[in-house]
Amino acid sequence: MDFILNISMKMEVIFKTDLRSSSQVVFHAGSLYNWFSVEIINSGRIVTTAIKTLLSTVKYDIVKSAHIYAGQGYTEHQAQEEWNMILHVLFEEETESSASSESIHEKNDNETNECTSSFETLFEQEPSSEEPKDSKLYMLAQKTVQHIEQYGKAPDFNKVIRAHNFIQTIHGTPLKEEEKEVVRLMVIKLLKKK
């Protein structure tokens, strides 16, 4: 219980700080992953109301503040993409199509559980113990794990968040859905070995 309380307090500090910069949001998400990674992998599942609420808050903030950045060449669509990347890299969440900040705000209450559903599903499916048959996919998984481990530590967080491209493409060719799933399970298996 002390552990959960300690983590919740850390999260409050993270998300109550200035969220106006998308790069800061990326940093905060990276820090959150670093704090949770070992405990999540070892215990299998840690989901609290605080996580659900705070992640939903961050999601809305990214899209909402995009209007501020529009004048600097940072569009609302780019803000939504930033959030999709965060979910994809950190929580294996399916990316969603770009939506307006108004619709995000309207659906915010209904989507409280969405951000953490990935915490649960990530460990419900055990990766296969078989040796990887596709060395390209395995190398891709290893690259992804390397980026996840560096997340929150690298000086350029925007560059790190774009590590999702390692999951999306191989030599510029988009992965098939079944290939993405293979890589996802490989990543889980590699993380559990840490």
From Swiss-Prot:
GO CC, alphabetical: host cell cytoplasm; host cell nucleus; virion component
The UniProt record lists the keyword Phosphoprotein: yes
Posttranslational modification: Phosphorylated on serine residues in the 115 N-terminal amino acids.
Cellular compartments annotated: Host cytoplasm; Host nucleus; Virion
Residues spanning the signal sequence: none
Family as reported in the entry's similarity comment: Belongs to the asfivirus phosphoprotein p30 family.
Biological role stated in the UniProt entry: Modifies the subcellular distribution of heterogeneous nuclear ribonucleoprotein K (HNRNPK) and may contribute to modulate HNRNPK functions related to processing and export of mRNAs during ASFV infection. Necessary for virus internalization.
Oligomeric and partner information: Oligomer. Interacts with host HNRNPK.
Record's protein name: Phosphoprotein p30
